[in-house]
């Protein structure tokens, strides 16, 4: 008995073709109204007299088990069809008007194309078709009539037939552009035997591949099929009116056991490559695709296919799939096209039952990445096992001010990060800052997946990007008396981990529409590092006592025997005796020393003078000293410093009795930091709310001396000249005349070259000192970085 492989039908059917395939007495499919029950098939010998077509009937009470008495023919197979409107099947194809007689007489076809899911295909058993297949098997598997139309098919459409050999199925004629193939009865027996030795694996439906892929949302990578079309597709043999009602995919409940391609999330790019259905079980083999004979299935997405579950618990649905057992073997899959290629028959009974069960969807890479981000997010200091180690290191650290010769590297700017890059270059050129961050170990993501100190981690990583500069070449003589020094900068890089801090710590600098300001960003960095170090200190001493931080012994500032209880005092307030036995009430914030305050932290004293009342003084910590340069009298940095400490009157001050009194205020420097950062306030806010830039030239020296008149009375005579003298090592410039835009660059002193470098994002070049202190009109100094000369 000859076995024939299934014939597949794709594409739109003309009215004539529709009548030839589905309406003629020898070839028709009659589908009664859907009853939601399991299906069965009547054999040819059971057909009533005078009835020349097969009728698909739906059982009502029970599933009809396979019977040995039923003849094995006509045989049926389960296959999957793609949307007939898919471009790869209709491109360049013309609908065949005439169908071979063998097909018209003996074949029954059904095609479901709602989605790329399982299809219903009937195998032919006619002698005429067998003769056609036998004649064409040696000629590449194409019939004579269809071979003439081969040029009209899409490129590469028949490429899968080239690999046919002795073990492959014999090709057959084409029906509406698709081929059928024939195997041997021996192969079917081998497939049936192979089925029995397969281990049980989690079953699945013929509706979807083992790795469910969403064919609706987009094309599958590495698949030859583009996105399928499902909007206007109609199942062959069904009326238009019942199409949407019968085949619309409903939303499955959570406990539904049915898996369809339309409801599964995308979890990969592979689909099942080789599988077969035999005796109600799905088989997979590495080298061949086999199909069971004699089964035609209907799908019911809501049908309960678990035999252990009561029927009353089965959820309602629309399309039914009768199934009772499936054994797919896990095999890497490629695409849905593999379901149609080189199909081989296998011996089986007419009925095939496929059991489907839901399996938890494999998490997508994006979902797992988000979970990793959550796990690698910020954690409290108490939950960070590495935090205590860093805290112990910071407690014993000694600040090193020795200059280090680093190989310069530019910073790539792919956004509006020039204000950040300029600030980072100045901090890298600061020796104590560099040594501090190099003192802290650099932990990898594996060693420290969770962190409580993102700011410290980022700057430790930044400083480790820079290494000692190689021995510089000897200066060479150029034209005239100029000495030209060559510089060999390292490769530029993009510090994305630094940029990410703006969003990780949720700084206001990350808000859209804000003007990027280098001074504001510097404050963001220094305050952030200071706060993280404070939190680490609390690990070592949770009950840390509040200590007043002052420049010098406490006994020099406070006379205990002259303290008076004013009734308004607090732990942070005391009376201080100044020159000429004048007393003042001094208040200060809770200062806790950290390595950052040890580098950049200075103190200013603000004294308020009021008639017939004691002076009131306040100590404040600063990282950058704000210098007002708006006055026309201010032309140099020294002028701005003198203006800072000048005594000013406060207008409109009244007492509790609402009497206006004369009040004045004066600011002095209480403590000078090792690294003094001067901020030239070039951006002035107007009363109307606008902002303008002061483009006036301000002269600044390389060596800056802080005069005694700028210091507080208690420390004027306690600082030597070398402790009040600073040397310039970095300048941050702002380019342009606009306050709402512009560009930032940095000049830094390179100790290895004993000269200056100009760094503009990733561009590094050598300049002379004159270009630093006398910039052109289009670039104005904005931040001046000085170091104390006694620490050089």
Curated annotation (Swiss-Prot):
Gene3D superfamilies tied to this protein: Cysteine proteinases
PTM note: Phosphorylated by ATM following DNA damage, leading to stabilization and translocation it to the nucleus. Ubiquitinated. Deubiquitinated by USP13.
Region feature G3BP1-binding, mapped onto this chain: 6-21
InterPro entries per UniProt: PAM2_motif, Papain-like_cys_pep_sf, Peptidase_C19, Peptidase_C19_UCH, USP_CS, USP_dom
Enzyme class: hydrolase
Substrates-to-products reaction catalysed: Thiol-dependent hydrolysis of ester, thioester, amide, peptide and isopeptide bonds formed by the C-terminal Gly of ubiquitin (a 76-residue protein attached to proteins as an intracellular targeting signal)
Biological process, per Gene Ontology: autophagy; cellular response to interleukin-1; DNA damage response; DNA damage response, signal transduction by p53 class mediator; DNA repair; monoubiquitinated protein deubiquitination; negative regulation of canonical NF-kappaB signal transduction; negative regulation of stress granule assembly
GO cellular component: cytoplasm; cytosolic ribosome; early endosome; intermediate filament cytoskeleton; nucleoplasm; nucleus; protein-containing complex
Lineage: Eukaryota, Metazoa, Chordata, Craniata, Vertebrata
Gene name of this polypeptide: Usp10
Residue ranges annotated for the USP domain, each copy included: 409-789
Mechanisms controlling activity: Specifically inhibited by spautin-1 (specific and potent autophagy inhibitor-1), a derivative of MBCQ that binds to USP10 and inhibits deubiquitinase activity. Regulated by PIK3C3/VPS34-containing complexes.
Keywords, sorted A to Z: Acetylation, Autophagy, Cytoplasm, DNA damage, DNA repair, Endosome, Hydrolase, Nucleus, Phosphoprotein, Protease, Thiol protease, Ubl conjugation, Ubl conjugation pathway
This protein's name: Ubiquitin carboxyl-terminal hydrolase 10
Subcellular location(s) of the protein: Cytoplasm; Nucleus; Early endosome
Region listing for Disordered, in residue ranges: 126-164, 300-323, 350-369, 542-580
Highest taxon, organism lineage: Eukaryota
Inactivation phenotype: Mice with a deficiency in USP10 show more potent resistance to RNA virus infection.
Biased composition (Basic and acidic residues): 300-309
EC number: 3.4.19.12
Organism: Mus musculus (Mouse)
Residues annotated with N-acetylalanine modification: 2
GO MF, one annotated term: p53 binding
């Amino acid at each position: 008995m000859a076995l024939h492989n299934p014939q597949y039908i794709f594409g739109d059917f003309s009215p004539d073709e529709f009548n030839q395939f589905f309406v003629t007495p020898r070839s028709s499919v009659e589908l009664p109204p859907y009853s939601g029950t399991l299906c069965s098939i009547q054999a040819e010998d059971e057909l009533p007299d005078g009835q020349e077509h097969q009728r698909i009937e739906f059982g009502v009470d029970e599933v009809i088990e396979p019977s040995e008495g039923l003849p094995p023919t006509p045989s049926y197979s389960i296959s999957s069809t793609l949307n007939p409107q898919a471009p790869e099947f209709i491109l360049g194809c013309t609908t065949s008007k005439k169908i071979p007689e063998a097909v018209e007489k003996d074949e029954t076809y059904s095609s479901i194309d709602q989605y790329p899911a399982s299809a219903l295909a009937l195998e032919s058993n006619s002698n005429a078709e067998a003769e056609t297949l036998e004649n064409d098997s040696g000629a590449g598997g194409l019939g004579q009539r269809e071979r003439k139309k081969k040029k009209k098919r899409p490129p590469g459409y028949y490429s899968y037939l080239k690999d046919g050999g002795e073990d492959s199925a014999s090709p057959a004629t084409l029906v509406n552009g698709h081929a059928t193939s024939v195997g041997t009865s021996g192969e079917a027996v081998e497939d049936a035997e192979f089925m029995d030795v397969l281990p049980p694996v989690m079953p699945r439906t013929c509706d979807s591949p083992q790795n469910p892929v969403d064919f609706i949302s987009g094309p599958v990578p590495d698949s030859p099929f583009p996105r399928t079309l499902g909007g206007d597709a109609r199942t062959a043999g069904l009326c238009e009116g019942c199409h949407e009602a019968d085949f619309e995919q409903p939303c499955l409940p959570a406990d539904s056991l049915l898996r369809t391609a339309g409801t599964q999330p995308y979890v990969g790019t592979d689909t099942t490559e080789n599988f077969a259905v035999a005796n109600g079980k799905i088989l997979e083999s590495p080298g061949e695709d086999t199909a069971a004979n004699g089964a035609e299935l209907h799908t019911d997405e809501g049908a309960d296919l678990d035999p252990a579950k009561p029927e009353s618990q089965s959820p309602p649905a629309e399309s039914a799939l009768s199934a009772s057992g499936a054994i797919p073997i896990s095999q890497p899959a490629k695409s849905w096209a593999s379901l149609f290629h080189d199909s081989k028959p296998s011996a089986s009974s007419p009925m095939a039952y496929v059991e489907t069960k839901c399996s938890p969807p494999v998490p997508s890479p994006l979902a797992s990445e988000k979970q990793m981000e959550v796990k690698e997010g910020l954690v409290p200091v108490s939950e960070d096992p590495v935090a205590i180690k860093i805290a112990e290191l910071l407690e014993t650290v000694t600040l090193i001010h020795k200059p280090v010769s680093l190989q310069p590297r530019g910073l790539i700017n792919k956004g509006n990060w020039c204000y950040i890059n300029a600030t980072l270059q100045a901090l890298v050129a600061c020796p104590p800052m560099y040594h501090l961050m190099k003192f802290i170990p650099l932990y990898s993501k594996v060693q420290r997946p969770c962190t409580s100190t993102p700011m410290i981690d980022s700057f430790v990583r930044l400083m480790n990007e820079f290494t000692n500069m190689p021995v510089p070449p000897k200066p060479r003589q150029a034209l005239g008396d100029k000495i030209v020094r060559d510089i060999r900068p390292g490769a530029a890089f993009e510090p994305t981990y630094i940029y990410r801090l703006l969003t990780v710590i949720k700084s206001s600098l990350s808000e859209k529409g804000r003007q990027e300001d280098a001074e504001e960003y510097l404050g963001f960095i220094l305050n952030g590092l200071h706060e993280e170090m404070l939190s680490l200190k609390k690990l070592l001493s949770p009950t840390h006592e509040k200590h007043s931080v002052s420049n010098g012994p406490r006994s020099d500032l406070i006379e205990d025997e002259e303290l008076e209880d004013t009734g308004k005092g607090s732990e942070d307030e005391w009376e201080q005796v100044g020159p000429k036995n004048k007393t003042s009430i001094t208040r200060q914030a809770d200062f806790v020393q950290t390595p950052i305050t040890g580098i950049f932290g200075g103190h200013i004293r603000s004294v308020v003078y009021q008639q017939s009342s004691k002076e009131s003084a306040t100590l404040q910590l600063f990282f950058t000293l704000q210098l007002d340069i708006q006055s026309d009298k201010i032309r140099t940095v020294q002028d701005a410093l003198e203006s800072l400490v000048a005594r000013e009157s406060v207008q409109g001050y009244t007492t509790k009795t609402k009497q206006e009194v004369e009040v004045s205020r004066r600011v002095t420097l209480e403590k000078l930091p090792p690294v003094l950062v001067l901020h030239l306030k070039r951006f002035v806010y107007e009363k109307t709310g606008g902002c303008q830039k002061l483009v006036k030239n301000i002269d600044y020296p390389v060596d800056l001396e802080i005069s005694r008149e700028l210091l507080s009375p208690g420390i004027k005579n306690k600082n030597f000249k070398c402790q009040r003298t600073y040397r310039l090592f970095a300048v941050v410039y702002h380019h342009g005349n606009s306050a709402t835009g512009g560009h930032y660059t940095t000049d830094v002193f390179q100790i290895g070259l004993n000269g200056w470098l100009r760094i503009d994002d990733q561009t590094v070049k050598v300049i002379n000192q004159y270009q630093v202190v006398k910039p052109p009109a289009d670039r104005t100094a904005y931040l001046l970085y000085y170091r104390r000369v006694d620490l050089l």
